Amino acid sequence: MGKDGICRVEDGYYSKTIRFYDINYQLAQNEDKNAIFENWCDFLNYFDSTIHFQLSFINHHSNMTEYEDVIRIKKQNDSFDDLRMEFAQMLRNQLAKGNNGLVRTKYITFGIEADNIREAKPKLERIETDILNNFKAFGVSAYPLNGAERLQIMYETFNQNVKVPFKFSYDDMLRTGLNTKDYIAPSSFLFKNGKDFQMGDTIGAVSYLQILAPELTDKMLAEFLEMDCNLLVNLHIQSIDQMKAIKLVKSKVTDINRMKIEEQKKAVRSGYDMDIIPSDLNTYGGEAKRLLEDLQSRNERMFLVTVVFLNTAKNKQELENVVFQTAGIAQKYNCALKRLDYQQEQGLMSSLPLGRNWIPIKRALTTTSTAIFVPFTTQELFMGGESIYYGLNALSNNLIMADRKKLKNPNGLILGTPGSGKSFAAKREITNVFIITKDDIIICDPEGEYFPLVRAFNGQVIRISPTSHDYINPMDININYADDDDPLSLKSDFILSLCELVVGGKNGLEPVEKTIIDRCVRLVYQDYLADPIPEKMPILEDLYNLLRKQEEAESQRLATALEIYVNGSLKVFNHRTNVELNNRLVCFDIKDLGKQLKKLGMLIVQDQVWNRVTVNRSAHKSTRYYIDEFHLLLKEEQTAAYSVEIWKRFRKWGGIPTGITQNVKDLLASREIENIFENSDFILMLNQASGDRQILAKQLNISTHQLSYVTNSGEGEGLIFYGNTIIPFKDRFDNTLMLYALMSSKPEDVEKREKLGIKGRDDS
């Protein structure tokens, strides 16, 4: 085994291995499935008769330590350690529910005959490049394995119950005089019994799949791979030269025709109708002719295929049980699992990803029949680093851990009907972000739901209402407000949006009015920009006074419309900011603003968040912003346009916004607002109303099967969209935990919170 991953399997035979990852096939729309299937057929047709290739699917129980390392949350010796440890225990419990201890990996190994390594290397590298490009064509991630990685696969196959991790380096090999086999071999091999074998303290059995079914289905391989046990499935595939394949089939057609003639002669001699011949001959004759037609005119090739299964267990009884389970799946699809009697050693070697088949049992299949063993099922989402918990994969029961920062565009949406668990999902993410990252978190809370959670983490709740003494100034600006030399341009956009909410009717602001506002904005900031001290920060009243001084009639109309917000009963936003916004966790509670001011409040909060994002950018710090009732910002054209613009800008500035809404129709009200979807690589979709389901299916290209996960689904169930990955999820959060009481907004849980002595919003 060379460092570069090229293995000399036998004299004159060399191979390489590529690991590839899953894509969503079982959940895909039929047309997408067909496209994947056709691509897979083209992929198989790439291999000519000089290349032997092997598909390996390995399910093995891994050491849980590596998973526990990903979800481990360390104490930080602060007042939140109790909640931190409670969340960590919840993650461990969820990990135990899933199959994360069972690792499923997929490989393709390809080999060629060559006189020496110098001849083999360029050929193998060319094939490797072609395979990687073919995988890339249908969105499959793949990478070639080096020598140590290939050896590790074999070590883990031979030493399944050994807790000692694989340790190997080529430098050690030179120093010790050992060879690669010494590093991977188990303590012993025993092939005494013809039906099974022993390696170390593991017992195993190798079987082959006898393909009897007249038609195969793409679900068969997927069902084998869903088994919750140690299992290696290997498909050895050898392409037959096209001319040889056609010649072979023609000779079979000739043989069948000869047999027909013999039967017809026999019929004539016996005095009965010469058309009455054995039905099998007619059947075989028709099939052989169709096969010949496929090879000659339908882009089909002929392959020799061997499907080998290696089951392993700790004892004989357990082994017989898993072999019986495997055989049951084969039987379900009208095939048979046959034990390789007295060929267990050859079977074991054929089960290693070496690209060599030592089993003489082969079945001839066309491209389409071979491609029915589609190697794709469903994707998993389990990332390291600062990954956040999003529930369990509804198909595999594995933990879903994802880091939105790794996406090209981390902006996100949480969509769902009332009661589907939208705000709970947002609070769960906020909690997870708070305890494992250093990110700032800002919440716009139109319903007053987030108070208990924010207070539990010593966050700052800024309650904005006509009677409150907490003020934020919509005119606040800082020098970093925009990424060019003119921060006033973006601020002017914001003030235009604000004035549209205040003044604009159905048609919004007139062009003349926009010009007047823009002029006044530039004038009102002159003193502050010349000497940027807090005392010179303008307030709405300064803008109002400037509008009054303008000569145009429209400026008087604008000023009159602003008057109620400056001198009237809605003057809550005519003050300088008097609250510190330096806390890591800030919640703007705007529940008491009333209908008239709520949209305005949300817009002003959004601007305050933008100010925070611009400051944090300089400190290389991420800012997460959660906007509940997000649809309220999208109803007026100018505020929608401003929100879309901010949504686009957030990514570049280290902001990670999350819109939470039940009104999908508002999100798709115009082509411009649709940009929010296009600029959001993360969507958490919970139960959806019938009309919204159809809209989303069209917008996000969701299959009917995928839609079933957001149709009358339970609380905390749905689909997660992470980049190009779509996974059905479920989250059954332990309702006995303190965190659950802090996050839930159900009336019965509010009562439980009160019994635990946790203050609610109205108790503060």
Question: What kind of region is each of these model predictions?
Answer:
Residues 422:
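Conserved lysine of the Walker
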Residues 425:
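Hydrophobic positions on the alpha1 helix immediately C-terminal to the Walker A/P-loop
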Residues 458-462, 672-685:
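A short helix-turn-beta junction within AAA+ P-loop NTPase domains corresponding to the substrate/partner-engaging
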Residues 700-756:
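Conserved P-loop NTPase
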Residues 432-442:
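Post-Walker A helix-loop "phosphate-sensing" segment adjacent to the P-loop in P-loop NTPases
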Residues 414:
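Hydrophobic anchor at the beta1->P-loop junction of P-loop NTPases
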Residues 1-378:
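Extended, folded cores of ATP/NTP-driven motor/assembly subunits in large transport
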Residues 23, 30-49, 56, 60, ...:
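P-loop NTPase motor domains
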